[in-house]
């Protein structure tokens, strides 16, 4: 046999083998039936529906969170809108109290002025109460650094250490939030 014949004999089985492989692949790759295609489409549709449902739940949760956050911000703004204004009025209350302390209670000539200042102070404190502005007057109470500012410490016998012995300036809170701490003198051990 010549080499050409050998090559042809060798080539033919390879061609047949390739043809056989193609035929086998074609037989395996039989086109799916309409029912199989429908089943595949239904599976894909179910996946898409599930993804959309999850996205919808997340979107609704986000909307609720935004709504709650906005409501909380509005409540916070309403609750503490007066904070700066109230802070400015504190000095008025302080000055009225200082004026009362400076007036001689025994002097009949100043009785009318004293009553006028007392009524004005009472009116101001009533307005504070209507808007939840509370006065902090910690006389004879234990020192609380969250509500009080110690201006000085003085050794005092027969008084518990860290007790407020004098209030220099009353403190105030608006809806539980400290506007100004009470400025106090605190006792220390002798």
Swiss-Prot record:
Residues 1-33 are annotated as: Disordered. It comes from the Bacteria. The keyword Cytoplasm applies. Gene3D superfamilies: 3.90.20.20, Head domain of nucleotide exchange factor GrpE. Keywords: Chaperone, Cytoplasm, Stress response. One of its GO terms (biological process) is protein folding. Its main location: cytoplasm. GO terms for cellular component: cytosol. InterPro entries: GrpE (IPR000740), GrpE_coiled_coil (IPR013805), GrpE_head (IPR009012). It is found in: Cytoplasm. Residues 11-32 have a biased composition (Low complexity). GO terms for molecular function: adenyl-nucleotide exchange factor activity; protein homodimerization activity; protein-folding chaperone binding; unfolded protein binding. Belongs to the GrpE family. PANTHER family: GRPE PROTEIN, GRPE PROTEIN HOMOLOG, MITOCHONDRIAL. Homodimer. Participates actively in the response to hyperosmotic and heat shock by preventing the aggregation of stress-denatured proteins, in association with DnaK and GrpE. It is the nucleotide exchange factor for DnaK and may function as a thermosensor. Unfolded proteins bind initially to DnaJ; upon interaction with the DnaJ-bound protein, DnaK hydrolyzes its bound ATP, resulting in the formation of a stable complex. GrpE releases ADP from DnaK; ATP binding to DnaK triggers the release of the substrate protein, thus completing the reaction cycle. This is Protein GrpE. It comes from Alcanivorax borkumensis (strain ATCC 700651 / DSM 11573 / NCIMB 13689 / SK2). The lineage of its organism: Bacteria, Pseudomonadati, Pseudomonadota, Gammaproteobacteria, Oceanospirillales.
